[in-house]
Curated annotation (Swiss-Prot):
This is RNA-binding protein Hfq. Belongs to the Hfq family. Residues 10-70 form the Sm domain. It comes from Symbiobacterium thermophilum (strain DSM 24528 / JCM 14929 / IAM 14863 / T). Keywords: RNA-binding, Stress response. The keyword RNA-binding applies. GO terms for cellular component: cytosol. One of its GO terms (biological process) is regulation of RNA stability. NCBIfam families: Hfq, PRK00395.1. HAMAP family: Hfq. InterPro entries: Hfq, LSM_dom_sf, Sm.
Length: 90
């Protein structure tokens, strides 16, 4: 994985976590989790579903869909992945 793709992935997950945006997480086996991203690392994502946190391996993920539109652009998401602060677009 290139640094740019890692930054986009990290920025996307970090934005969902930081802004407490609910998401539907689709797994490769077809199962869906609807909840909140609580944390992540290189290999796993912690998802809170119905008040309980589940640790899901990234290789089991297919798609993550936010419940509402994200308030920022892709370039801002990438900056969030690099640890920079991101402000919403007007």
């Amino acid at each position: 994985m290139t640094k740019a793709s890692a930054s986009l992935q990290d920025g996307f997950l970090n934005l969902l976590r930081r802004e407490n945006i609910p998401a539907t997480i689709y797994l490769v086996n077809g199962y869906q989790l609807k909840g909140y991203i609580r944390g992540f690392d290189n290999f796993t994502v912690a998802v809170e579903v119905d008040g309980r946190v589940q640790l899901v391996y990234k290789h089991a993920l297919s798609t993550i869909t936010p419940a509402r539109p994200l308030p920022v652009s892709v370039s801002q998401i990438m900056r969030a992945g690099e640890g920079q602060e991101v402000e919403g677009e007007e």
